[in-house]
């Protein structure tokens, strides 16, 4: 009987997601890459923490993955470097992240809505749809998405920015999972959201102050979730430091994830279209075809309304909590590594070539930034 309820709930979730995307998304949205062959090697060994047998077998036994598998979740406010992070990890031979699924945060949000409504939650319990049944169904759904939308690998990774708002619940589902929280100066994040016209529920792209307030609320939830999960399970990664010092940061990250070091993570741009696939509708795809460079660090300076600049400390108190100076315009993020400075120079020197590569990976070439001629390194 329990098995039947779990199967019915999984079926409901599948139907819900299919209905959502049929009605809310265009048919040519490439969430899944059908051209890739499956890697049939063994998945990673089970972690130290154990779960009851019926939870371990909630997915097909031949998948090689279960709820104790050491999955990797990358999250953060959109436009905070999550795509760069997943591309660098995708360059590692033992890791596969892939494009945003977009469905995993929605499933987590659906469960959150059920949980918040005492009336709805009680109805589910009375129907025999207990928390355990829901957990098994949602974890099975998440694993099906993670396993099915790309190549198999020893370590599977998911990059959906808003999953980090549910890190505590995800840890309940996947006790051996690791989380990477991408953090970026909120002023840069909001400027990028507005300038690139990234639609996020609740963000008014015509109101910089309101967007800063929304950023502050979102990153506060994510930081609190990360800290609740604990430093052994969740690592905060600052976008600025990843760009300025990629080797030091990636060594820190690979050690945290317990995967061997590989220099390929420093040269992800060489694997685009090979081991790394990009979605032509994601707003960052045209940027991550390029090597790690400094161009995006201070593009926001001079774009913020003066009244918002004056009130920044009160508008976005999380800036100071995260270590940013809300009164610094421009800020001093630090001096870049020599390799990063050279790669930035190459991006400028060969701007036309990188521009051609960028327009090939998007469905709207008009949104791709034109090549930069002036060297911005000296401004940092």
From Swiss-Prot:
Lumenal side, ranges: 28-380
Disulfide bonds: 97-157, 226-234
Active site: 100 (proton donor/acceptor)
Region (Interaction with peptide substrate): 102-106
Record's bilayer topology term: Single-pass type II membrane protein
Site residues, Transition state stabilizer: 159, 284
Catalytic function, reaction form: L-tyrosyl-[protein] + 3'-phosphoadenylyl sulfate = O-sulfo-L-tyrosine-[protein] + adenosine 3',5'-bisphosphate + H(+)
Domain of life: Eukaryota
Family stated for the protein in its record: Belongs to the protein sulfotransferase family.
Protein's name in the database: Protein-tyrosine sulfotransferase A
Gene coding for it: tpst-1
């Amino acid at each position: 009987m329990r098995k039947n309820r779990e199967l019915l709930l999984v079926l409901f979730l599948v139907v819900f997601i299919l209905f959502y995307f049929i009605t809310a998304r265009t048919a040519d949205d490439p969430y899944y890459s059908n051209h890739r062959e499956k890697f049939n090697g063994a998945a990673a060994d089970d972690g130290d923490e154990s779960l009851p047998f019926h939870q371990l077998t909630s997915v097909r036994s031949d998948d090689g993955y279960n709820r104790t598998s050491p999955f990797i979740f990358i999250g953060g406010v959109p436009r905070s470097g999550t795509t760069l992070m997943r591309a660098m990890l995708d360059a590692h031979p033992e890791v596969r992240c892939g494009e945003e699924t977009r469905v995993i945060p929605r499933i987590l949000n659906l469960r959150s809505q059920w949980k918040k409504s005492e009336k709805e939650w009680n109805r589910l319990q009375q129907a025999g749809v207990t928390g355990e049944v829901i957990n098994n169904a949602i974890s099975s759904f998440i694993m099906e998405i993670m396993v099915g939308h790309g190549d198999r690998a020893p370590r599977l990774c998911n990059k959906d920015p808003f999953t980090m708002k549910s890190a505590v619940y995800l840890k309940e589902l996947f006790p051996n999972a690791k989380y990477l929280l991408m953090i970026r100066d909120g002023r840069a994040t909001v400027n990028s959201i507005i300038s690139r016209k990234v639609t996020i529920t609740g963000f008014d792209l015509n109101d910089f102050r309101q967007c800063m307030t929304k950023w502050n609320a979102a990153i506060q939830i994510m930081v609190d979730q990360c800290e609740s999960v604990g430093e052994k399970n969740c690592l905060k990664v600052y976008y600025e430091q990843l760009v300025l010092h990629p080797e030091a940061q990636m060594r820190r990250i690979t050690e945290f994830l317990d995967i061997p070091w590989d220099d390929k993570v420093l040269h992800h741009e060489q694997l685009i279209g090979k081991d790394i696939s990009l979605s032509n509708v994601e707003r960052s795809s045209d940027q991550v075809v390029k090597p790690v460079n400094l161009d995006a660090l201070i593009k926001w300076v001079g774009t913020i309304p003066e009244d918002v600049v004056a009130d920044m400390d009160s508008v976005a108190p999380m800036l100071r909590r995260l270590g940013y100076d809300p009164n610094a315009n421009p800020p001093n993020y630090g001096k870049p590594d020599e390799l990063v400075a050279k790669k930035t120079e190459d991006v400028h020197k060969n701007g036309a070539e990188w521009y051609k590569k960028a327009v090939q990976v998007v469905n709207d070439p008009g949104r791709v930034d034109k090549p930069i001629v002036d060297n911005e390194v000296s401004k940092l």
